[in-house]
């Protein structure tokens, strides 16, 4: 199942479980914990008091009561004290133990906040990496649907170095291209009606009276055929492809079982990333689905940057797209 990044109030998530990042005393809550407690009701607070305490890296579970979620999983993140006291391992344990507890209780979906990157002082970039690496590693062996929930855009941003490189690429390609395009538009408007109509080879055959049946036979290789030929050529398993593409198994099955499947552009990009395609290969696959990779679109320009630089980590790409308010690759909306 995919890792979905959403901007939402975690108390409103309709998942089987949500995660509350708490202090050691579960009867006392921080800002987010208080919001969860207020939404869940008095019985929730009573159960928290019965649980008592939670050690750093540990996870405990209560019912969700008045929340849309069936359960709340409580975990205590580490306070950052310089990075030399095992904070990274403790933070990883928070995510791992919460996921294990969710699975033990039959949860098929879970929503996480970013743990310890707020008041506990964990460096945001490092905290995001631990969260996404731990979750994506867990997803290799489970069908659980996992959400990373952030309150605002500033909570989840690309690293400063990466963002600087991407912004430069956008300035060189997307911005300049669109400025030039606006100038060309004026010229094109003056030339309407002057250009001759040019037919492709297929159009000429059809215009000459070729039967519809023969015309259809002459069509190009389909997206479906091209995709599975590429998977075979790359020597990859289907499970490896849909995991790397941040797609659910059921979504990939639809693609596999429907020869006429028409994917969204974001899905094609996700599959290109999963297959580690070059930019030319990506353009060809995109064309088979009826799209083009164009600098006229911010999404295309950002993904092109990652492909041309050989960076195929779909979570890193999605964090960047999220940072620029663009659709995510392989992401399933809640």
Predicted regions and their residues:
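Glycine-/small-residue-enriched capping loops at alpha/beta junctions
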Residues: 1-102
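Active-site-proximal loop/helix of nucleotide/amide-processing enzymes and allied scaffolds
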Residues: 88-101, 116-145, 262
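A short, Lys/Arg-rich alpha-helix, primarily the initiator
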Residues: 201-238, 315-334
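Recognition helix of helix-turn-helix/homeodomain-like DNA-binding domains
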Residues: 246-263, 287-290
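The alpha-helix within a helix-turn-helix
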Residues: 231, 242, 272
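Divalent-metal-activated hydrolytic enzyme cores
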Residues: 122-209, 213, 329, 333
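Short, basic-rich loop-to-helix N-cap that marks the start of a DNA-contacting helix
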Residues: 259-273
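Short, charged recognition helix plus adjacent turn
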Residues: 284-311
């Amino acid at each position: 199942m995919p890792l979905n990044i959403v901007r939402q109030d975690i108390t409103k998530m309709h998942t089987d479980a949500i995660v509350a990042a708490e202090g050691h005393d579960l009867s006392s809550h921080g800002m987010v914990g208080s919001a969860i407690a207020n939404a869940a009701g008095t019985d929730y607070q009573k159960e928290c008091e019965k649980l008592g305490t939670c050690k750093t890296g540990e996870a405990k579970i209560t019912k969700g009561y008045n929340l849309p979620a069936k359960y709340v999983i409580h975990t205590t993140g580490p306070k950052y004290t310089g990075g030399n006291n095992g904070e990274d391992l403790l933070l990883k344990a928070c995510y791992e133990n919460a996921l294990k507890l969710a699975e033990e209780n039959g949860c098929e979906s879970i929503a996480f906040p970013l743990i310890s990157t707020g008041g506990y002082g964990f460096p945001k970039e490092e905290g995001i990496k631990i969260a996404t690496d731990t979750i994506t590693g867990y997803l290799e062996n489970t069908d659980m649907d996992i959400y990373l929930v952030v309150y605002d855009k500033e909570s989840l941003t690309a690293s400063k170095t990466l963002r600087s490189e991407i912004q430069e690429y956008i300035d060189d390609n997307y911005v300049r291209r669109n400025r030039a395009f606006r100038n060309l538009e004026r010229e094109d408007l003056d030339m309407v009606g002057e250009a001759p109509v040019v037919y492709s080879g297929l159009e000429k055959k059809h215009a000459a009276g070729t039967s519809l049946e023969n015309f259809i036979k002459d069509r190009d290789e389909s997206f479906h055929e091209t995709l599975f030929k590429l998977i075979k050529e790359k020597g990859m398993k289907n499970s490896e492809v849909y995991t790397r593409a941040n797609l659910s198994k059921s979504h990939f099955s639809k693609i596999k079982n429907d020869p006429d499947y028409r994917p969204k552009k974001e899905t094609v990009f996700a599959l290109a990333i999963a297959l580690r395609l070059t930019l030319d290969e990506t353009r060809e696959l995109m064309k088979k689905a009826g799209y083009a990779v164009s600098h006229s679109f911010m999404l295309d320009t950002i993904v092109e940057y990652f492909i041309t630089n050989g960076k195929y980590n779909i979570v890193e790409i999605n964090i960047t797209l999220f940072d620029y308010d663009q659709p995510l690759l392989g992401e399933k909306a809640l």
